[in-house]
Each structure stands twice: as C-alpha cells, then as structure tokens.
Amino acid sequence: MAMIRHSNSRRVLVAHNVSRGNSGGMARLMESIHTELESFGWKTEYFTADDMPASGGQRYRRYAFTWFARRRAREAFLRGEPFDVINIHEPSGAAIVLGRSRMGGPAVVAMSHGLEQRYWELRLRKDPPGPDPPTWKTRLLFPATSLWQSRFTLRRADHVFCLNEEDKSFLADRFHLHPENITRVFPAAGPEFSSAANRRNYDRPCNRVLFSGTWIERKGIRQVIEVFSVLSGRHPSMRLGILGAGVPASSVLADFSASLHSRITVHPPLSHPDCAEALLGYDVFLSPSFFEGTPLALIEAMCTGIPVVTTATCGMKDVVEDGRNGLLVAPGNSGAIVRSVELLINDSSLRRRLGKQAAEDAARKYTWRAAAEIVNAAYSGLLKSKADHR
C-alpha cells in the first residue's frame, strides 16, 4: 500500500528496550549520537522501555518489545511519516526485519552493545576465573527466546553497528557478514569531562579507587571485591567509590565485609557535570569487565585524565594501550589488578603520564560529533543504496 509522505526530513526510529535518560551506557550512547545527528538533517524518534505497557510483567515486556516497536513503525507509515531507518537493538529485532514491507521498507540497522552470541559462548566455556556458567533453566530458555532473535536480526539486517573490533571480526567470520555491512561505532564523552582534566591533581596521595558500571558479574564485580579487600588491608587510607551500580547501595555493600563499609561510597545516579566532578575525586579507575562493547564509562574516565586499569579484552583493548594511556590486565586476574593499582599508588609520575595521555587521546578521538559522523555515513549510505535499487 503506497502512502503519501508528509515530510522531506530523514527519519530514524531508535528502538532499544531501556529507559530514556537512563544512567546506563546504552541509553546515553544512543541518545547522544542521535542528538548530534540532527545537525546532519536527521529527525529521531525513540521507542523504549518507557513506551511499553506497564501490565504483563518484565519478562512479557522484554519478549513483546519487538512487536510493539514494529507497531510504532507501522503506525508512522500509515500516517504518511515512514521511517527511513530503524535502529534496533540486536535481541529485539526479529519482528522488525520480518515486517519491513509493512513499514514502508525502511533500512534496518542492528545495534550491538556487545554481541549476545559471543558472551553466551564465553559463559559456556566454564573457564575460571570467567563469569559463572548459566543455569540449566537459562540454557534452555535463553537460546529459545533471546539468542535466536539476536542471530536472526544480525543476519537479516541491512547493516550492523558494533562497539569493538572483536565483535566486528566475529560478525564477519562467524555470521559471514560482508565487512561493508558492519560499522564499528565508538562511544564518546561530552566537553564537561575533558575540561575536568585540567583540574586533576596527580601529586596528592593516591588512595581513592573508582569502579563505574552496573553491579553485575559480567562487569567484574568479584574482582572489585577481591581487589579492594586486599588493598584496604595493605593501605589503611584506601577508599573505594562505586558509580552507576543500578542497584541499591545496600545491595552493593552486602557483597563486602561489614568492616569495609565505612570506606566505600556508593554514589547515586549523577548528571554528566556531576559525574565529571566525581571522577576528579578519585585517583585510579577500575574497569575489570569480562565482556563489553566499549564502556562509555571508560571513555568518560579517560577524558578526565584519571589513570585506568582495565582488562585486555573487547573494546577496552581497542582504546587502552598498555603502558601508554592506561594499564591492561588479563580478565579475572585480581592479583594483576592489585599490582597495577599499587604501581600507580607508588609512582605519581606514572599516574600523570598515563592520565594525561588518556585525556589527550580521548579528547581527540572520542567526541559525539565524530561518532555521529560515522553513523551518518552509514545511514546515508543505506538510503543511497535503496534509491539506487529502485
């Protein structure tokens, strides 16, 4: 059914099953890039967890999200305002890629924030000290509900965005996607983080360590607990900060010895300026994840000039060069993390050199404008390809 288009602007629907304005990296990444895309002539609409019906429970809303997103796109088509591009998170895209013709034939871009298939295989390996293997219930339900949808979406989408080189290679080698149909997207940080770097003090005592991320096993929280337990015993003035946990402070503190609670600060959700200011209050940044895309929190930290200790995997090893702009350790190696932190504790010149190089690299490479230019090129290429094949 042909409809009369009422607008000449280029329209994109971003459909990701998280809340808008969420302090988590996924929402911030997508909103920041697409806000910047307005200067390229794009008009963005969002379909998020906030738009789902409150009834039915969390599991229902998760599985039904793809159908409600499809309905939103169909309604836009019927009123003469079809979307040119739909950016859909990989585990939620099956109904979108199946129903393109009923939505006006938009280009479909599958967005991965860390490939579901790769993390699933990591969990199945049972290689200590990696993440715990899935329960038998999860082994049955996850492939039958979410994992198949991720595979289907990635293979059927017109284009795929990913957040690290390992994922990009996996998509080409295992999913047999053409390299031209894969774009590596970078997270970025706003100017409030870069400007904070000018006020960092590398000469004060190094006794405050920060972990920023959701308080889940995949982020390496067991290693955070182990590392701080050791460091606090060796260094009486050592303090730990936790930012963006996504769970109540009481839940985080319950994972530590009660004797350490007075030395731990669990920050509430912070605005971007307040987050940049909070980062200035710490001396070392820990990112011990087993699996990620590329952590937005890592880029923000680097922008403020805080020396980082992170794992040599996923997007972390794409942006951190060991000994140049940060320190890399093997995933799960708590002892190596302790040694790296103590190396920084004992050497202010090393803290300064790594931190300043991190700030310089991040300010130069990881801006929202640069990220939007990459996304605009991919979107525009898809529209040109569609026009050429009409």
Across the structure, where does each feature detected by a protein language model lie?
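A short, well-ordered alpha-helix in the C-terminal region of glycosyltransferases
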Residues: 343, 350-365, 374-377
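Conserved acidic donor-binding segment of nucleotide-sugar-dependent glycosyltransferases
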Residues: 322-323, 327-334, 343-349
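Glycosyltransferase donor-sugar binding loop
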Residues: 212, 239-252, 268
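Short hydrophobic beta-strand element within catalytic cores of glycosyltransferases
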Residues: 307-310
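Membrane-proximal helix-turn-helix segments that form the acceptor-binding/catalytic region
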Residues: 131-160
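Aromatic "clamp/platform" in nucleotide-sugar-dependent glycosyltransferases that forms part
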Residues: 290
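Nucleotide-activated donor-binding/catalytic signature segment of Leloir-type glycosyltransferases, i.e.
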Residues: 251-273
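Conserved donor-binding/catalytic core segment of Leloir-type glycosyltransferases
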Residues: 201-228, 241
